[in-house]
Amino acid sequence: MKNKYHIFFTGMLSIAFFMGATVDTKAQDSIAVVSRVNIEHLKAMPDLQLSNTLQGQAAGLIVIPNTGGIGYANSTFYVRGQHSNGTNKAIVIIDGIERPIDDILPEEIESIEVLKDASAKILYGAQATNGVILVRTKRGQAGKRVIRFGAEYGVQPVTRLPEYLDSYNYATLFNEACVNDGLLPLYSDADLQGYRNSTGVNDLLHPNVDYYKEFLRSSSTFRKATLELSGGNARAKYAVTVGYTGSSGLEKVGDRSDLNRVNARGNLDIRITDFLSASADVAARVEKKDWGAKDGGGMFSEISTLRPNEYPFMISAEDIHGHNGIAADETSLLFGASSRKSSNLYSDMLYGGNTSERYVNSQTNLGLNFDLNEFVEGLAAEAYITFDNYSYLRQQLRNDYPTYSIDRYLNAAGDEEIRFTERKKLNLPKKQSIASNSTYRYFGWNARVKYNRSFGLHDMGANAAFRYTAEEATGSSQDLKEGNFTFRANYAYNKRYMLEATLAAMGSNRFQGDNKYFFAHSVGGAWIISNESFLKDMKAVNLLKMKVSYGHLGYAGDTDFFLHRTNWRQGDKEEFKPSTGANTTDLIRLGNPDLKWEYSNELNIGIEGRFLNNRLSGEVNYFRELRKNIIGINSAKYATIGGNFIPSENIGEVLNQGIDACVNWNDKVGEDFTYNLGLNITFTKNKLRKTNELSNIEDYRKSIGQPTSAIFGWQSQGLFGKDVAIAGHPFQSFGNYQVGDIAYADLNNDGMVDNNDQTRIGQSFPKTTLGVDVTLNYKGFGLYILGTATTGVT
C-alpha cells in the first residue's frame, strides 16, 4: 500500500515556502552534530502516523516501520544504528519533554532536529544516549498574523497481494505431498472433481474460498483538515492549531475499521514586564477507533492462514435440519467450521460484535522566562513545569453464532452420510464489556540559567540546567523518577575556533544507593576554516567547518526496577506424613546491589560546508561508540542445576561505528521556478564484544564478534537428491527428511546436524539507509518526491 493518491485543497492568508538556501546561524556556530528535517516535506506525506513520514528525511536517522491495524502501523526511531544488544530506540523530546511523536500533527511543528553526538545528547538525561529526536512546536510572532486552512482526501490502493491456491489445486498438491511422505492421498478423485466444480464459499462439502477477494477492499481512505491561527504583538503572542484526521480500513465484510482523531494545541506567550514573560502551552488529542470483532491484524492473520477448503461460510437450514437432532429453519444463522478451526471468519466479521478504543491525551507546559540583560549583560533564565495525562479505554462486545464442522462417514449399510459436529454455541451478550483500560501521567520541571557575552574577538557562554521527571502508570509497581543537572561552558575566538565542555550529573531510581547517580561529560571543538584569511576571499566557499567531539554518557533507559533486591514468593504446600504439611517459600531472583549504569564512550569527527552562494551544502561525520556495562543475565557463569534465579549483572559490551552524510543542491531557474535535490546516507556497523556466552564453544557459534542483530540458523548445502545425496549425509535431528528437502551442514563434524551446528546466516537490522528527495516549486504549485532504500538485511 505504498502508492497514495491525494487531492489537496488549501487556502491561506500567509504563504511561506521552504528554501534550502536559508542559513541557520545557530547551526553554523554549533559544535554539536545535528540533522534538521524539512517540515514542509512531512506535510506533503499524508499518513496517520507522523513517525512514518520521517523515513529518509535525515542523515543518521533510521526509521523502521512496524506492522499493525489502522492507527497502529507506526515506526521506531534509531539514531546511528544499534548501540546495544538491549533497547536501542531513540527518544522523542517535544517542547522539552519526552512525548510520543504520533500525538501531534506536522502543522503543529516548527522544527525537528536529530541529535546524534555526545555533545548534543548529554543535555537530555538518562534516556538520551541512544539518540534524541528534538521537536519544537510553533509559536506566534509579533506583527505577523497567519491564518491557514488545509483539507485533504486520499485513497490508498492496495498495490500487491499474495496469490493463494484455490481448493482444487491445494487438494491436488496436498495429495502429492502425502505420497512423497509415503502416505495415502487424503482427497479422493471425487473430492478433486467436487473442488473443480465447486459452487463457491457456501458449497457444503467442497467449499472454494479466495479469502483476499472475499474480505478485502481494493483501497483504504485518508482524510484530514487543519486550521492554524497565529499572531500577536509586543505584549502577547499566540499560536493555535486544530486538526482532524481520519481513515477507514480495507475490510469488505462487516463493520469497516474506522479511526477519527482530533488534535488541538494552543501556545501563548505574554510579556509581563520588561524582564519577565510567561508561557502557557496546552495540547489535547482525542482519538476513537472502531472495528468489528477482529481488527486489521487479526483479519490478515486469518485470511493468510486459512485453507481455501477450510469450511463453508454458511450452512443452510435445509442441509442441517434433522441431523443429530438439530432443529433449523430459514431464520437460523449457522456457520461452517472444521476440526482445526472452531470459529468462522465470515461469522466473526459480519456478526461477531464490535470493539472500540478511546484515547484522551492532554499535555501542559507552564513557564517563566527572565531576560536579565538589564541587570547583567548576556544573562537570562527560564523555568517551567509540565504535566501530561494519557488515558486509554477499550470496550468490546463478542457474539458467537453456532458453528459446525462437517465430516463424512459410512453408515452401517455402507452408504456415505454427513455428520455435523457443533463447535460453538450461540452466545449473544447484551452490552459491551471493558476489555482493558490504563492511565499514564508524566510530571516534570525544568530550570535553566544561561549567560552569553562577547568581548571583542572573544565569545563566551555558560549554561546551567536542571531537569526532573516523574512517571506513573496503571499496573506499574514503581514510579519512574529521574533527574539531570548539566553545566556547559563554551568559548569561541574570532569566529574561527570554538571549544565546548559539559558536565552532567544524572540520577535514576532504577538503581540503588550510590549507584543511583552517574557522572557524564563531553568535550568538543570546531574550526571554521572558511573564516581564515587564506579562504576568506574565496567567494565559492561560504562555510567550511571541521568539528570533533567526545563524550562519556550514562544510560538507564530500559533497566528493570528492583534488580538490586532478592525476590521471594510463597510456594506450594509440602506434605510431610502424617502432618498436614507446611507452606514453602521460593526464591525468584537473586539481587545485585552493585548493579551500575550502562555507559558509552562516543567519538565524532565531522566536516560540513556550504558553497556557491549556499546553493551546495553538505556534511560528513564519522562516529564510534563503545557501549559498556550492558545489563543482562550471565547464565554462562552459573551451573544450570542451580535454578533459574540468576542475578542481573553488567556483562555486555558493543562497539558501534559508521558514517552518515548528506548533500543538498538548491537553485532557481528564472523568477518562478525553484528546486532542491537532496541525498542522505547512513552506514553503521556494530559487533558484540562481550555477552552471556560460553568461551569454549566453536567460533562459528559465537555471537561475540557478530552484529547484535545477527540471525543464527542452519547453513544450507542445497537439496537432497539434487545437490546432496541422502546416503552418507550426517543425520538431521530435527524431523524426517527426504529427497527434495534441504540438506544442512554438519559444521562441527560430529556426524549429526543439531543445534550445535547453527551459525550466523544473516542479520535483521540494515547496514545502510538512503534517502533521496526532490522538491520542485513553480508559481505556488509544488511537487515533492522521496525515495528511500535500505541494504544489509539478509
Identify the role of each PLM range.
Residues 89, 267-276, 282-286, 319-321, ...:
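Extracellular/periplasmic, surface-exposed regions of secreted and cell-surface proteins
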Residues 97-139, 160-165, 209-226, 245-281, ...:
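Outer-membrane beta-barrel proteins
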Residues 377, 763-793:
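Glycine-rich, aromatic-lined ligand/substrate-binding cores of catalytic
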Residues 148-203, 666-764:
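Conserved small-residue
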Residues 347, 732-739, 790-794:
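Extracytoplasmic gating/loop element in the C-terminal half of outer-membrane beta-barrel translocons
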Residues 1-265, 277-279, 337, 697:
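Short, small/polar-rich motifs associated with maturation and membrane association
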Residues 92, 737, 747, 774-776:
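Short aromatic-centered micro-motifs
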Residues 123-125, 143-144, 157-160, 289-291, ...:
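Switch/connector loops and helix/strand junctions flanking conserved nucleotide-binding motifs
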